[in-house]
From Swiss-Prot:
Composition-biased stretches (Basic and acidic residues): 1-10
Protein source organism: Ajellomyces capsulatus (Darling's disease fungus)
Disordered, as annotated region: 1-47
Covalent link location (Glycyl lysine isopeptide (Lys-Gly) (interchain with G-Cter in ubiquitin)): K132
Gene3D superfamilies, sorted: Histone, subunit A
PTM characteristics: Monoubiquitinated to form H2BK123ub1. H2BK123ub1 gives a specific tag for epigenetic transcriptional activation and is also prerequisite for H3K4me and H3K79me formation. H2BK123ub1 also modulates the formation of double-strand breaks during meiosis and is a prerequisite for DNA-damage checkpoint activation. Acetylated by GCN5 to form H2BK11ac and H2BK16ac. H2BK16ac can also be formed by ESA1. Acetylation of N-terminal lysines and particularly formation of H2BK11acK16ac has a positive effect on transcription.
Protein name from the UniProt record: Histone H2B
Highest taxon of the lineage: Eukaryota
InterPro entries cross-referenced by the UniProt entry: Histone-fold (IPR009072), Histone_H2A/H2B/H3 (IPR007125), Histone_H2B (IPR000558), HISTONE_H2B_site (IPR055333)
C-alpha cells in the first residue's frame, strides 16, 4: 500500500549552507511513541571545510562570493587531497616500519603528490604552520 501524502517528509536533511562551520555526523532514529505516531528524524550533520574556504576567500577577495555548487566542488577537492596525502604518508610510515605518521612523512608525501612549484609552496606553508604551532604550544 503506498504511503499517504501527509506522511511524506521533505528531503533537506543532507544539505548544508555554504558558510557554515564543520559539523559532526549523527545517526537519526525513528521511534514509535505511545500514541503510535512516528517521531521526526534528527538532521544528520555533515563535516565540511566550507567555513574555512569562505574565510580564505574573504582574505584574498573580500568583495567576492561563492555559490553552493562551487563550495561543494572545493570541499570535494580538499577531501581528495587530504585523503591522498594521508594514504601516501601511511605507506611511507609502513615502508620505514614506523607506527606513527610524523611531519616528515606528511612533507614527503606532499612532495610526491603535488607537482613542482605547488609542492614547494605547500611545504613552505606547512613548515611555517608547524613552527607557529610549536612556538605557541610552549
Amino acid at each position: 500500500m503506498p504511503p499517504k501524502a501527509a506522511e511524506k517528509k521533505p528531503s533537506t536533511a543532507g544539505k548544508a549552507p555554504a558558510g557554515k562551520a564543520p559539523e559532526k555526523k549523527e545517526a537519526g532514529k525513528k521511534t514509535t511513541a505511545a500514541g503510535g505516531e512516528k517521531k521526526k528524524r534528527s538532521k544528520t550533520r555533515k563535516e565540511t571545510y566550507s567555513s574555512y574556504i569562505y574565510k580564505v576567500l574573504k582574505q584574498v577577495h573580500p568583495d567576492t562570493g561563492i555559490s553552493n555548487r562551487a563550495m561543494s566542488i572545493l570541499n570535494s577537492f580538499v577531501n581528495d587531497i587530504f585523503e591522498r596525502v594521508a594514504t601516501e604518508a601511511s605507506k611511507l610510515a609502513a615502508y620505514n616500519k614506523k607506527s606513527t605518521i610524523s611531519s616528515r612523512e606528511i612533507q614527503t608525501s606532499v612532495r610526491l603528490i603535488l607537482p613542482g612549484e605547488l609542492a614547494k609552496h605547500a611545504v613552505s606553508e606547512g613548515t611555517k604552520a608547524v613552527t607557529k604551532y610549536s612556538s605557541s604550544a610552549k
